[in-house]
Amino acid sequence: MTQKNFVELRNVTKRFGSNTVIDNINLTIPQGQMVTLLGPSGCGKTTILRLVAGLEKPSEGQIFIDGEDVTHRSIQQRDICMVFQSYALFPHMSLGENVGYGLKMLGVPRAELKARVKEALAMVDLEGFEDRFVDQISGGQQQRVALARALILKPKVLLFDEPLSNLDANLRRSMRDKIRELQKQFDITSLYVTHDQSEAFAVSDTVLVMNKGHIMQIGSPQDLYRQPASRFMASFMGDANLFPATFSDGYVDIYGYHLPRPLHFGTQGEGMVGVRPEAITLSDRGEESQRCVIRHVAYMGPQYEVTVEWHGQEILLQVNATRLQPDVGEQYYLEIHPYGMFVLADAA
């Protein structure tokens, strides 16, 4: 069954003076999906979020929510909620009052409001915190209160503006899992903004990568990582080693190293291939074309991050710390897993 497109941007452009921040963007978010805007600072992702929210108006184009043109509607008329990086909680109110503030403004009866606040706090693992204040809880708990405040209103669309940026690594991991769990549980159509690739992969059905106001590629996290469409995408989605290659009927040749050609490779002749660090291993045996020299080793806990020189090119790979302990200057033979390669159709 095809999912309904619930949020849609049609030919949307946004200018600030003479500066074009968003250039003719088309974007759809199917009902119940989490779509993440990912890109470097200044790429336009937050501007798109603000356009969907109604905090900015497009210079050109239209915005639809649930089939209705909301281009010129205010944020109050769009039935959306936003979770901010800064939490935006009221310090003079209790947590229960913060969570229930929107319902209070809507005139929800006191008894119903109290019950829904209790339920919302329980959803984010803060049951019994109604009477505490913002300065009595941690940053991670504050972000969960902000999430409860958004969920309690049961919005059509939920927007996330880099909500985990102020949290440490462990809190980010647990909070992103909680966001994804609740988004799927309540089937809320959501748009998420981040510059963190691992965060985008963990929470998203679909990731949209932006650069300089343009969409570079759209796809599932797996597709974007395994089949990047350009040199920019290959490097932005994670570490990537890029090699000139020759493609024949049965093989891929990289610096004389012959690899079985994967079935999905359609290219013939000369081209560029990419290989992720985890698809390269080191061996004590191999052909002369595979010989490499260790140039740098960094211990990363469960693995070593190793830089080797291979045919005059420095490449990055990962080595399991329990299996091999390479030292600078040692020689090994490099092995590439054929199905860890991708072809760059656009090497620009």
Curated annotation (Swiss-Prot):
Q: What is its EC number?
A: 7.2.2.7
Q: Which residues form a coiled coil?
A: none
Task: Supply one GO CC term from the record.
Answer: plasma membrane
Q: Name one GO biological process term.
A: transmembrane transport
**Any idea which UniProt keywords this protein has?**
ATP-binding, Cell inner membrane, Cell membrane, Ion transport, Iron, Iron transport, Membrane, Nucleotide-binding, Translocase, Transport
Return the SUPFAM superfamilies for the record: MOP-like (SSF50331), P-loop containing nucleoside triphosphate hydrolases (SSF52540)
Enumerate the SMART domains for this protein. AAA (SM00382)
EC class name: translocase
A Pfam family annotated for this chain is ABC_tran
One example of the protein's molecular function in GO is: transmembrane transporter activity
UniProt subcellular location: Cell inner membrane
- Binding annotation for ATP: 39-46
Q: Which reaction does it catalyse?
A: Fe(3+)(out) + ATP + H2O = Fe(3+)(in) + ADP + phosphate + H(+)
Q: How does it sit in the membrane?
A: Peripheral membrane protein
ABC transporter domain location is 7-237
**NCBIfam families in the record:** PRK11432.1
Family label: Belongs to the ABC transporter superfamily. Fe(3+) ion importer (TC 3.A.1.10) family.
Print the miscellaneous field: In E.coli, the afu system seems to have been deleted by an insertion sequence. AfuA is totally lost, afuB is partially present and afuC is totally conserved.
Question: What is the name of this protein?
Answer: Fe(3+) ions import ATP-binding protein FbpC
Tell me the organism: Escherichia coli (strain K12)
What would be the name of the gene that encodes this protein? fbpC
